[in-house]
Each structure stands twice: as C-alpha cells, then as structure tokens.
C-alpha cells in the first residue's frame, strides 16, 4: 500500500472529456463543435478487500475522499486507523483499496451496507429511515469567526474549481482560515464528495487546519452538516440555502450553520455566538 498522503498526479484535462456538442444562441443554431464535459466515474471504496460503497465522483483526490468518507461516516475515528491506500482501475471505474485496522474492520462488517451511487448521494443504501440523522457528539464552542473576513474567501473559492471553470459542472469545498484566506480546497461533481475530500485533507494536515470553517459552493443538506460535525467542524458556510433537516441537525449538534453567503451578507441559521460581525 502507498502512504495515505499519496495522490494521483494528473492534469485538469484528465478530468474532462472533449465531446462534439451543438450550441444554441438566440436565432442561431451553431454547427457542432468540441467542448469540455466533466468526467464522472464510479468509485468503489474497498476496505481490506471488501467493497463497502460505490459513489459517482470526479476521478481526482480520491485518497482524500476515502479518508474523509471514512471519518465522516464513523468508520474510523482517526487517520491512524488507516494504514495505507491504493487507487487502482477496475473494469467499470476506479477502486480505492484501503488497509483498515482489524478493530475498525470488524466494526465495519457488523454495520455493513451497500451503497449504489447516484452522484454524491449520502442516503443511498441506508437500511432504515431511523439511520438518517444518527447521533453526533455535540460540538464544543472553541471557534470564532469574523464575518468581515468571509468576503475574501468567497472571492477565491472559484480558484479551487479548475474543472468547474472548463465545464460549469462541479461543486467546491474549501477550508477558510480565521483571516479569510483559503488554506485549500477540492472540487467534485458531487457536493458530498467534494466535502469528504476536504474533510479527508483536513484530517491529514497540520495544526493550522484546526482553526477556521468549511465553505461549500452548494446548498447545505443534513448530510453535509452531519459529516462536518462528525469531523469536528464547528462552522459551515454554504453559498446557497440550508434545508430544514440540516438546520435541525446543526442545532442539535451545536454546529454554526450559515447559508446564502454572498459578499457583505449571509443568513445565520444556528448558533450565531461563534460569529463576530465587524
């Protein structure tokens, strides 16, 4: 197995395909021409030789995705419980082969579920409706964020969507430092997958990634709130709206949820005490 920090070294063009498309503009149906379309492939997460989940995803940053999914789904509590990963092609897509600790693998087998992937679907394969909104340890109130610094982050979020710039087809998730600087970010055709990539990256970065907040380019669903809380993220900013269940879960687990984030404005759904308005 390769070191868990190993990543696929590919160019942005490896995540797009040129296809012949016909463009329409008012009163003008143009002749077919080549344009970029985002790649979407089945990605199987295989723990100790057993396939656990198949998700539709962009074929990059997959070790970060596997780490983030493992943490946000409660398969592991610490990156140290994964000993290594390899990304390998399979007949229909890609596999991330994960070397999981024996103790965690026994627990995984006890709760095993088969997820058949729609794009970034966080609910597919849950065996009972009662499994939705599983209990999350309430978060501490150890973080604060000055909303005056959010504009800087919003301005540069698009920098982490190179495939999105070519295709208009990806979501982004980025880590915002207290200063508003973006420490890093990831993109994917699935918003949940983009967030898992960010959470996996954060788990393997240094202490500077402990302070700050997560920022997503999409709406905030309950799964995204729950994944963030499972990974100890206290503040989640979303460019679009939040759902009612997302607000309920955020309230229950002490997560500060903020939606409709635009320059100079935002909607605070839960726990505003972490936020400073300058």
Curated annotation (Swiss-Prot):
GO biological process annotation, one example: Mo-molybdopterin cofactor biosynthetic process
Positions that bind Mo-bis(molybdopterin guanine dinucleotide): 260-265
InterPro entries, A to Z: Cytidine_deaminase-like, FdhD
Active site: 121
Cytoplasm keyword on record: yes
Keywords attached to this entry: Cytoplasm, Molybdenum cofactor biosynthesis
Family as reported in the entry's similarity comment: Belongs to the FdhD family.
Name this polypeptide is given: Sulfur carrier protein FdhD
